[in-house]
Design a protein with these regions (language model features):
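Glycine-rich, flexible N-terminal cofactor/catalytic loop recognition
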Residues: 1-58
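Short glycine-rich anion-binding loops that position phosphate/pyrophosphate groups of nucleotides
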Residues: 12-15, 82-86, 162-164, 188
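Conserved helicase motor
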Residues: 54-62, 134-139
Length: 220
């Protein structure tokens, strides 16, 4: 009898936000499929658990095949990303797609999501929204994606890394104008958490003089 693939959310920053069901699922799993085994090892140490792990981040198609074969032989797998809900802007989505196609039972074990957490505290319209995840790395492709969003009336949510924030703010300003409202949510649930609602023009000016630090969720 085949096992089960559990899609397990982990805290987005503060380990005290760990739901009991998440810890129990890790404890009951035969093995863990992790985005980065080093990050997940810290989580397991916090929980006092030892489990065999495999990383799925690189070559998700090939790694996924091995993971799914183990589940088909009866093992239960807990799949997690470094933080938040896996398989959203994450290569784990390929594994879930293939698991469903092969008739493997997939069970969500939800917890915090940086996207929804940022939206809730953004002060922007939360009635209708769209999640864009990370914008393309290629500058031309990024500008094309932003051009597609020019007519978007829903609140738009992006993820961004600190080393790319300045360029992204410049591109957003060029596309939407410096008066466009934006909320920058930095290091959510962590020690240096910051939620700043401002305009694109003010954000560009601020980060021209200040180094971006930490992971960002942009809500505009």
């Amino acid at each position: 009898m085949a096992g089960t693939l559990y899609i397990v959310a982990t805290p987005i920053g503060n380990l005290e936000d760990m739901p009991p069901r998440v810890a129990a699922t890790f404890g009951a799993a035969d093995f863990i499929a992790a985005e980065d085994t080093r990050v997940t090892m810290k989580l397991l140490n916090f929980l006092g658990l030892k489990k065999p792990m495999v990383s799925y981040y690189e070559h998700a198609l090939q790694k996924g095949e091995g993971i799914l074969r183990r589940i088909e032989t009866g093992e239960n797998c807990a799949l997690c990303s470094d933080a938040g809900m896996p398989c959203v802007s994450d290569p784990g989505e390929v594994i879930v797609r293939d698991a469903l196609a092969r008739g493997i039972k997939v069970v969500p074990v939800p917890a915090a999501s940086a996207c929804v957490t940022a939206l809730a505290v953004s002060g922007q319209d939360t009635s209708r929204w769209v999640f864009e995840g990370f914008l393309p790395v290629n500058r031309k492709q990024k500008k094309e994606r932003l051009a597609e969003l020019l007519g978007e009336k829903r609140t738009v949510i992006f993820y961004e890394a600190p080393h790319k924030l300045r360029t992204t703010l410049d591109d957003l300003t060029a596309a939407f104008g410096e008066d466009r409202s934006i909320t920058l949510c930095r290091e959510l649930t962590k020690l240096h958490e910051e939620i700043w609602k401002t305009t694109l023009g003010e954000a560009v000016a601020h980060y021209a003089a200040n180094e971006p630090r930490g992971e960002y969720v942009l809500v505009m």
